Amino acid sequence: MASRGGGRGRGRGQLTFNMEAVGIGKGDALPPPTLQPSPLFPPLEFHPVPLPAGEEGEYVLALKQELRGAMRQLPYFIRPAVPKRDVERYSDKYQMSGPIDNAIDWNPDWRRLPSELKIRVRKVQKERTTIILPKRPPKSTDDKEETIQKLETLEKKEEEVTSEEDEEKEEEEEKEEGEEEEYDEEEHEEETDYIMSYFDNGEDFGGDSDDNMDEAIY
């Protein structure tokens, strides 16, 4: 019969690490807990390497700081949102919160860079002002009469031009009709001559044979 534990022992739990590696032997008591706070600045085991001294190191440091400042002034640098004040002032609109594109003194050789990265200068939009046109004085009666006379003269000229064109068209049509009639008369004369000269009714046929009519006909 199997035991109650199903073959599982109920011994003491084994440690997951070797105590001798920590420095505690078998049978030794554990050190008492420390109730004091840890030191604020514990001693450093590894000290940082000293900065390179000399002109070369100072030049590299200044160049790095200048590059950082230039990158922060570019329009592509994302700045944190500034919290708005509870009370807005009138002068807040005109204060420059950051550098404008025109104030950036950075002119690289754009031939070596893609065109998408080129800085586009913002143009200040001017406020549109409404232009008030002066009112034209009303036309007097003399001006109206002059315009009417001009229109009448233009109408007369147009009528004269149209009448001349109509007369020219009528003359051309009459000439064409006369030419057609002459052509028809000539054709008619030629047709009658042809009929008179070549028509044969057959009366003269067999005129010489009338003397022999007394003979018997078979």
Curated annotation (Swiss-Prot):
Keywords: Nucleus
Record's compositionally biased regions (Basic and acidic residues): 139-160
Source organism superkingdom: Eukaryota
Biased composition, class Acidic residues, residue ranges: 161-193, 201-218
UniProt entry tagged with the keyword Nucleus: yes
Keyword Nucleus: yes
Region feature Disordered, mapped onto this chain: 130-218
Record Pfam families: RNA_pol_3_Rpc31
Example of a GO cellular component annotation carried by this entry: RNA polymerase III complex
GO biological process: transcription by RNA polymerase III
Cellular compartments annotated: Nucleus
InterPro entries: RNA_pol_III_Rpc31 (IPR024661)
Tissues expressing the protein: Expressed in the liver.
A molecular function GO annotation: chromatin binding
Protein family (similarity comment): Belongs to the eukaryotic RPC7 RNA polymerase subunit family.
General function of this protein: DNA-dependent RNA polymerase catalyzes the transcription of DNA into RNA using the four ribonucleoside triphosphates as substrates. Specific peripheric component of RNA polymerase III which synthesizes small RNAs, such as 5S rRNA and tRNAs.
Subunit structure comment from the entry: Component of the RNA polymerase III (Pol III) complex consisting of 17 subunits. Pol III exists as two alternative complexes defined by the mutually exclusive incorporation of subunit POLR3G/RPC7alpha or POLR3GL/RPC7beta. Found in a trimeric complex with POLR3C/RPC3 and POLR3F/RPC6. Directly interacts with POLR3C.
Name of the protein described by the UniProt record: DNA-directed RNA polymerase III subunit RPC7-like
Species this chain originates from: Mus musculus (Mouse)
